[in-house]
Each structure stands twice: as structure tokens, then as C-alpha cells.
A protein has these predicted regions:
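A feature for loop-to-transmembrane-helix boundaries and adjacent hydrophobic helices
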Residues: 1-258
Length: 258
């Protein structure tokens, strides 16, 4: 783990910040490329920008709320983003609200639908999530619980407080699974005639992998019953994605048979 990438007189460049910025830049670039393929490059880029801003705000807010026992006594740390700490679920919900509002806002007759914009943004989102996991690996956030007896899945890693132990390699595993999901979405995006397929497939992939990763995490969070809040949210994401995809598929078949 290399928390600091570069340090000079009066200046410190954190690895977490660099990787996070790389993810954001990749997300915007891929949104523009997909928007151009779908004949709406400007709209896709605008949607990505607003979604990104709302997503960052939601991600930090979700992390602070999930760790309120700490931040209630260290409130200034809530604004210190470079130290690490973003909630994927808070970021997703914030971005989803922004995208929904943007798609519904009346602008022009050729305005793209929510589903088309969501398709354009999803590959970049998933690649950004991979960068986010790598950033957490460097900063120690979203760390795995202590474990043993799991070859290749248990590494000697620190938590966010710098305490090293044999832990589930949650962050590297999250990055790897996210990259696999990105490759699938990117290589198959031209094969599907259903608008919204990439977005909903992304929900299923991110929800199912998120649920599995939550089982390995050791960081503090909210619990709803005996499950981490992230487990519930991941399950809802995967089920909602599957249900909506089935609905879109049935509607697509009905429209083409009429």
C-alpha cells in the first residue's frame, strides 16, 4: 500500500486522489464515446458531468453517515476527501437521482431517453468503480475482515487506521471483479437491441458482486438486522436490475410482435 504518491515541499499528492481522478476521467471519456456512438455525445457528456457531481456528494454523504460515530467527534474530517472514504451505494443513489432529473428535464425534441443515457454512462461507471477499489486499496478504506485459510484471497493488508493483519483482499478483489464486469459490458454493448440493457446488466453485475464483497468486509458500517446495509442494498440492486431487464425484454418482444 502506497498512501502518498509524491511529496514535495509544501505539497503532498495522495495515491487515493490520483486513482479516483483517473476513474472520474475515464468515466467522462467513455460516456462521451458511447454518447457519440448513440448519436448524443453532448447530452451524454452533460449527463455524465451532473451525475458525477451528484454521485461524489452522495458517496461522501453516505460514507459519513455510515461512520457517524467517528465523524460526530471529528466533523472537519468529513470534508477531507483525500483521506479516503466514499460509499458506493450513496454515490450510485445520488448519481441516479441526478440522471433521472436530467433525462426528464425538458430541453429539445430530440432529447435522449433515460435508458439511452444510462447505457452510455454505465461502462464508464463500472470502470470508475474499479479505480475506486484500487484507490481504497491504497488508502486502506473498505478493508477486509481478518481471515485465514483462504489461499489467494487473504493478504497481509492494513485497515484504514494502519493496523496490518491477514485479511480478505476485498479491495483488490473488488477491482478485479469490476474490471471483468467492464470488459463484458464494453465488448457486448453493440449486440443488444434493447435500450437499457447495458445499464440493467450493470446493475445485476455490480449488485451481485457487491453482495459477495460485503461478506468479506471488516470496516464499520450500518447494520440492518444481521446484515450489513451494503448487503441489503446490493441485493436490491441486483434484483431490481433483473426485474427491470425482464420487463424491458418482454416489452421489446411485444413491440416487435405487434
Amino acid at each position: 500500500m502506497h498512501t502518498i504518491l509524491l511529496r514535495a515541499e509544501g505539497f503532498t499528492l495522495y495515491t487515493y486522489t490520483v486513482l479516483l481522478d483517473m476513474g472520474l476521467a475515464c468515466g467522462l471519456i467513455l460516456a462521451w464515446l458511447e454518447g457519440r456512438r448513440l448519436d448524443h455525445p453532448g447530452q451524454a457528456l452533460n449527463a455524465a458531468f451532473y451525475t458525477l457531481c451528484a454521485g461524489i456528494l452522495g458517496a461522501r454523504t453516505g460514507y459519513v453517515l455510515a461512520n457517524w460515530s467517528y465523524f460526530s467527534e471529528h466533523l472537519p474530517d468529513a470534508a477531507r476527501l483525500w483521506k479516503g472514504g466514499l460509499s458506493w451505494y450513496g454515490g450510485f443513489l445520488g448519481g441516479l437521482v441526478a440522471l433521472t432529473v436530467y433525462a426528464a428535464w425538458p430541453r429539445r425534441k430530440t432529447q435522449p431517453s433515460f435508458w439511452l443515457l444510462a447505457d452510455a454512462l454505465t461502462p464508464g461507471l463500472v470502470l470508475g468503480v474499479a479505480c475506486g477499489w484500487l484507490a481504497c486499496w491504497m488508502a486502506g478504506c473498505a478493508y477486509g475482515m481478518p481471515a485465514s485459510g483462504w489461499p489467494w484471497l487473504v493478504w497481509d493488508l492494513p485497515d484504514i487506521y494502519g493496523v496490518r493483519d491477514l485479511r480478505f483482499a476485498t479491495q483488490p478483489l473488488g477491482a478485479a471483479l469490476s474490471l471483468v464486469a467492464f470488459v463484458f459490458l464494453w465488448t457486448t454493448r453493440r449486440r443488444w437491441s434493447i435500450t437499457g440493457f447495458s445499464f440493467l446488466a450493470g446493475l445485476i453485475l455490480m449488485g451481485s458482486t457487491g453482495y459477495l464483497l460485503e461478506l468479506t468486509r471488516g470496516d464499520d458500517t450500518l447494520y440492518w438486522g444481521s446484515w450489513r446495509a451494503g448487503q441489503w442494498l446490493s441485493l436490491v440492486m441486483a434484483v431490481a436490475g433483473a426485474g427491470l431487464l425482464a420487463w424491458r425484454w418482454a416489452r421489446h418482444r411485444r413491440d416487435h410482435h405487434d
